Amino acid sequence: MYKEIYLVDDEDLVNTVNAIHFRRMGMEDKLKSFTNPELALDDLRFRDDPNVKTLILLDINMPEMSGFEFLEFMMLEDFPETNKVLLVTSSESDEDREEAKKYDKYVKEFITKPLQIEHLEEFLQGSYS
């Protein structure tokens, strides 16, 4: 089971809606929400235990830093594989899907917005088994 869940999207409303999904599943105590991906990266870098099993819902298109740039930092800094990423995006671009494959060490799903609670539940059930 994930000990921490990071919501990383430049739109606060999107993070709020995604947080509601997790609250409905009784996971509100695990949530951390960021509208600035750089702050999310810093939080991941400087945690007490970097090996905590963490789920990161990551938007691709953000003004400060794209989701792919975020993933590039994770790769360059060799973040532990206990960090699993769900790319959540409004893009259905084949190019974005191909780009995501470069980060398959971390990226476990590519989900089109809006995030459906059923899809999230399926992913969580599959990742726990």
Task: List where the protein language model places each region.
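C-terminal output helix
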Residues: P114-L124
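Short amphipathic alpha-helix used as the core "switch/output" element in two-component signaling
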Residues: D42, F68-F79
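Receiver (REC) domain active-site loop signature in two-component systems and cognate sites
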Residues: M62
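Helix N-cap/capping motif at the beta->alpha junctions
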Residues: S33-D42, G67
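Conserved acidic segment of CheY-like receiver
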Residues: K3-L13, N18-F22
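Conserved sequence signature across two-component system core domains
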Residues: V8-D10, F34, I56
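Alpha4 helix (beta4-alpha4-beta5 surface) of REC/receiver domains from two-component response regulators
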Residues: E69, E81-N83, E92-E109
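Active-site beta3 strand of CheY-like receiver
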Residues: D48-L57
